[in-house]
Design a protein with these regions (language model features):
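Catalytic-site signature of metal-activated, phosphate-bearing donor transferases
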Residues: 3-163
């Protein structure tokens, strides 16, 4: 869902073939707009010329890439993105992402450093909850940090299971 500001700005936009347009995405956990945890602001390319941009081959968090230099234009307003209905839904999606990430590492023949194997999940929680201020999102911030811990732990578990 886009807000009124973004709708008006898109309506008045004169697109250019040498530009990409980024928009701010407000992610929700249930009905709660996550303001911290590194999730907001979250500027992403949402309008682009498909003749000069393409998606990379990542299984998780695909990115747009281009062989030519493009101007990045911010469009004010925001997109409301209801990623997770609740914590149970988040766990299901994160488990899926963990399996994909492990498969991606395997395909690339990349092995996580030993320190990541033992400390990665703990650091992920610490980074999300404290460094990225998830603590200020209250219960939602703790839920996200806890699930980030399990995501990293499961990525590593699935990677080493498949070896």
């Amino acid at each position: 869902m886009i807000d009124d500001t973004l709708a008006v700005n898109i309506k008045h936009l004169i697109p250019s073939t040498d530009s990409v347009y980024i928009m701010n995405i407000q992610t929700y956990l249930g009905n709660y707009p996550v303001r911290y945890c590194g999730w907001f602001p979250d500027w992403n390319i949402r309008l682009f010329n498909k003749n000069v941009m393409r998606w990379n081959d990542n299984y998780v968090h695909e990115k747009l890439v281009s062989d030519v230099s493009l101007k990045c234009v911010k469009i004010q307003g925001k997109i409301d993105h209801f990623s997770f209905r609740d914590e149970a839904h988040m766990k299901i999606k994160y488990d899926y992402y963990a399996r994909l990430r492990a498969e991606e590492w395997k395909k690339a023949q990349k092995s996580p450093p030993l320190i990541k194997k033992y400390f990665g999940p703990y650091f992920r929680f610490f980074r999300t909850y404290f460094l990225k201020l998830g603590i200020l999102d209250g219960k939602a911030g703790f839920t996200i940090a806890k699930n980030e811990y399990h995501l990293k732990k499961d990525e590593l578990k699935y990677f080493y299971q498949k070896k």
